[in-house]
Amino acid sequence: MRIWVDADACPGAIKEILFRAAQRTGVELTLVANHPIRVPPSPVIRSVQVAAGFDVADHEIVRRVAAGDLVITGDIPLAAEVIEAGAQALNPRGERYTPETIRERLNMRDFMDTLRASGVDTGGSAALSQRDRQAFANELDRILARRPSQG
C-alpha cells in the first residue's frame, strides 16, 4: 500500500497527521501538487510537483495509483476515479468514500454546481475542526491497521 495525497488543497494539519503515520508505519507517502510542498526528511515521504493547470495533480495521481493504495482527497471526481482503479479514498474530514457512496456524492456535487451556476449562494465548507482532524486520524489508523502485512 502507498498513500497518495492530492496536496494542493490538503490542510496542513492533515499533512502533519500523514507525516507522522508514514514515519510510524513505514508506508510510502507521496504528496502531489502543482507547487513545491515541503516534506520532512524521510525515506518514506516525498513530494511530486506537476505543471500548473486544472486537475493536473489529479491526473498524475490516477496515472500512478495502484489497487490497494490509499488516496487522500476532498475532490469527489478524483475519489471516484481511484475507487474505480481499486484504490481507497479518504477525505480530510475522515470520510471514507466507497463504491456504494461515491455515486451519491458525485450527484450531490453536480447538483451544487448547478445551483452555483444559476446564481444561488451555496456557502462554502466549514473550517477543519479538531473533531474533523480526530476523525481523519482515527479512520487513517483503521485503514493502516487493515493493510496486508508487508512480510
UniProtKB/Swiss-Prot annotation:
What is this protein called in UniProt?
UPF0178 protein Hhal_1913
Q: Which family does it belong to?
A: Belongs to the UPF0178 family.
Please name the InterPro entries in this protein's record: UPF0178
Organism, scientific name: Halorhodospira halophila (strain DSM 244 / SL1) (Ectothiorhodospira halophila (strain DSM 244 / SL1))
